[in-house]
Amino acid sequence: MKKIELHLHFDGSLSIPYASRLMGRDVTSELVSVHAKSLAEYLDKFTLPVRLLQSREDIETFASLLAKDLESDEVIYAEVRFCPLLHTGVLTADEVIEAALAGFRRVPEVKINLILCMMRNFSIEENKEVIRLAKKYRNQHVVAID
């Protein structure tokens, strides 16, 4: 059955096997929270994926793997959300977005658009940067901000 995925977190989609391969060890406990006692504890599980997805190659490769997973699940359209500013350890926010889009383009059978996320703990200027990026890429597969 063909499907549409409208709420998918890029960082939260990093698979345990892929993350473990990147880290060279089992990272299950760092990615899975069976009994999170608070939102902060739950969100802490995003720390490792964000840390692992800092290079153009890693972002692009993971984006293509995510697209392939969606395709195998018969998803024909997806809106993937993430905050590009979280991935700017060595890249610019533009490079982060372009890497994700390049990875998604490797699987043209799934139409994937981005929702750029602002963060509650970011400054007004940082969140304005997310808005600027959304405007810049609005005709290039960025469909919303959150």
Task: Report residues per predicted region.
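Metal-cofactor-binding active-site regions of metalloenzymes
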Residues: 1-146
